[in-house]
């Protein structure tokens, strides 16, 4: 599964501080020479790679990033203070483009990697700089140069091996938290997941990436709800994991919920509907041993599903180790 998230922002590096026009004026030195100091440099703007981010959503709300200007110089040859540089954190895997030239500025690969994207302006020169044997009282100064201003495009691409299917609030976010390092927000209401949540699942010394896409609803194949914006991403997964809540909080029928998801996949694309998958039946911890098999068989009969089934609890981890082993096996079989 390849997620492509994008954002456009404007960055403005700081302007250099102006040089000072000044002359030394002391009690016993009425005609002192120039003493105007240089200004400070403007702040650069850097991007820094940070683990733990998986979308560019925050850049849809904040689109302007501006570094501070350098301070002007002053008398007694005092230089203005240079501005602090501005560092903007972005997710690993993000490509950085100059939108005006289409130039690829760089790609964020490693945690805490630094990329300079806009240089601050150079400091202005005070009149002391222009003193010479010919001109002992120069009145010339220079302003600080402007900082770089760029229109920046950010593009984040992340590949996932397993895509999670399920109705809203089926327990997918809880499951991905249980078996991976993801920190997806979890609450007891539909549409908990509003953005793709990705987690790295480890099994001995191997790793796969699992993607929890927003829960599907009826007519998602027509764009209803969160629609086919996320359905289309399922094409590039190696396999799918369908999570069914055996006790939905909205009182809906687990069999109908399963069939709704399958129907939407078939309506969207037949090849997608035939993609290899596993079924995880969630909240099995709420049933006693004898009742579990009765409920599972009733679900399988109603859905006519005949593939591999895992009885799990995303909350307390019941059956999750076996599920992880099954996922790794499925991914290897479909590489």
UniProtKB/Swiss-Prot annotation:
Residue ranges of every copy of the OBG-type G domain listed in the record: 160-332
CDD domains to which the protein is assigned, alphabetical: Obg
Annotated Mg(2+) binding sites: 173, 193
Domain Obg as annotated: residue spans: 1-159
EC number per UniProt: 3.6.5.-
Any Gene Ontology CC annotation: cytoplasm
Protein's UniProt name: GTPase Obg
């Amino acid at each position: 599964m390849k997620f492509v998230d994008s954002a456009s922002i404007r960055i403005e590096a700081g302007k250099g501080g102006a040089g000072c026009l000044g002359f030394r004026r002391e009690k016993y030195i009425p005609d002192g020479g120039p003493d105007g100091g240089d200004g400070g440099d403007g702040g650069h703007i850097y991007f820094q790679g940070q683990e733990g981010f998986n979308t560019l959503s925050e850049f849809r709300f904040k689109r302007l990033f501006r570094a501070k200007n350098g301070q002007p110089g002053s008398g007694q040859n005092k230089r203005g203070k240079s501005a602090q540089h501005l560092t903007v954190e972005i997710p690993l895997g993000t490509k950085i483009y100059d939108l005006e030239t289409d130039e690829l500025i760089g790609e964020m690969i490693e945690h805490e990697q630094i990329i300079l994207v806009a240089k601050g302006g150079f400091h202005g020169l005070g009149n002391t700089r222009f003193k010479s044997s010919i001109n002992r009282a120069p009145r010339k100064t220079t302003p600080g140069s402007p900082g770089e201003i760029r229109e920046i495009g950010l593009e984040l691409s992340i590949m996932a091996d397993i895509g999670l299917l399920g109705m809203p609030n089926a327990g997918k976010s809880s499951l991905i938290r249980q078996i991976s390092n993801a920190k997806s927000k979890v609450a007891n209401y539909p549409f908990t997941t509003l953005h793709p949540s990705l987690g790295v699942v480890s099994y001995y010394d191997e790793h796969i990436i699992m993607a929890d896409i927003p829960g599907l609803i009826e007519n998602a194949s027509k764009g209803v709800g969160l629609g086919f914006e996320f359905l289309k991403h399922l094409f590039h997964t190696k396999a799918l994991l369908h999570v069914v809540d055996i006790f939905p909080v909205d009182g809906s029928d687990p069999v109908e919920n399963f069939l709704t998801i399958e129907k939407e996949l078939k309506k969207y694309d037949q090849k997608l509907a035939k993609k290899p998958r596993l079924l995880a039946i969630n909240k099995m911890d709420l049933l006693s041993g004898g009742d579990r098999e009765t409920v599972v068989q009733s679900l399988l009969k109603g859905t006519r599903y005949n593939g591999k089934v895992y009885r799990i609890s995303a909350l307390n981890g019941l059956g999750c180790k076996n599920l992880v082993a099954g996922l790794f096996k499925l991914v290897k079989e479909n590489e």
